[in-house]
Amino acid sequence: MTGYRVIHLTGIYYTFYRRKSFFFFFLEYLHNSLRVLSWKGIITKIAASPFVIVLYFNTAFFNPFKTLYENEKKKAKKNLKLTRENASLSIRKMHQYSAIIPSGT
């Protein structure tokens, strides 16, 4: 079958001659780029009907607010840990100073 190409575009098979119109070559290009994106983890799922192609994107790539939120969460956790350490240090210092202060004459 040298004259035919079969493209599997998200569940739909297109069979055509190699010398057909630009549209089919565009479909082939689209299919290859979708495959590459799904390999890289950007597209998680592809659903298709004869007229509509639905792409489910990985939100981490296209949702900067989510990553911002995650970063802020990490910072807050780190700050909380630091404040806990500082609090325990200050309590230790209080104990040291209370031991030094004479209880009476």
Swiss-Prot record:
Provide the protein's localization: Membrane
Cellular component, GO annotation: membrane
Q: Which UniProt keywords apply?
A: Membrane, Transmembrane, Transmembrane helix
Lipid bilayer topology? Single-pass membrane protein
Answer yes or no on keyword Transmembrane.
yes
| TM region(s), chain numbering | 41-62
Miscellaneous comment text of the record: Partially overlaps YJL181W.
Name recorded for this polypeptide? Putative uncharacterized protein YJL182C
Q: Which organism is it from?
A: Saccharomyces cerevisiae (strain ATCC 204508 / S288c)
